[in-house]
Amino acid sequence: MIYDYEVTTGKGETLSLSEFKGKVVLIVNTATGCGFTPQYEPLEKLYKDYHEKGLEILDIPCNQFGAQAPGTDEEIHEFCTLHYNTTFPQMKKSDVNGENELPLYTYLKSQKGFEGFEEHEFKSLLEKMFSEADPDWASKPDIKWNFTKFVVDREGNVVARFEPTADICKIEECIKALL
């Protein structure tokens, strides 16, 4: 369960995920300079529409994919609130893959591995880029790019993983079914 893990907020405070017991949680690694950055808009809409019903969103900025999350935690927060009016909690910029990855992400990936990209304008580009770098990329559970999302149910179980190419409507349906 995710309740065994902690993250650090953008303000440097430790946040135990046990605080989210009884809530549906959407965990997403983000970046401010990515082609998927406009996903902040529908994420904020999800938060506004379902927060009162028990949805929490954890925004975890990550600079591991194309260095697309430059700046300090404060600068990232300012960007998101200024351009997308985000109100959901934003965590400290962190790694989601590799030796310095958050333990939370080690757990998330162990529960829901990569199952492929959905049809999207960036699908071919992403697949080409990854296969050139690593022929075995598709068989690894690693986070592939910014805006990969994990949905956690009210009991703390990871129930779904959505790649950045997933339609937000699919994510919303998954969340609604759990609320």
Question: Language-model segments: which ranges?
Answer:
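Non-catalytic, surface beta->alpha helical segment in thiol-disulfide oxidoreductase systems
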Residues: 159-179
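Hydrophobic beta-strand anchors of alpha/beta hydrolase catalytic cores
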Residues: 24-26, 149
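Thiol-based oxidoreductase modules, predominantly thioredoxin-like and allied folds used
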Residues: 51-71, 87-98
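Conserved helix-turn-beta segment immediately C-terminal to the redox Cys motif
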Residues: 23-24, 32-61, 80-84
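N-terminal "domain-start" segment that seeds a small globular fold
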Residues: 1-18, 36
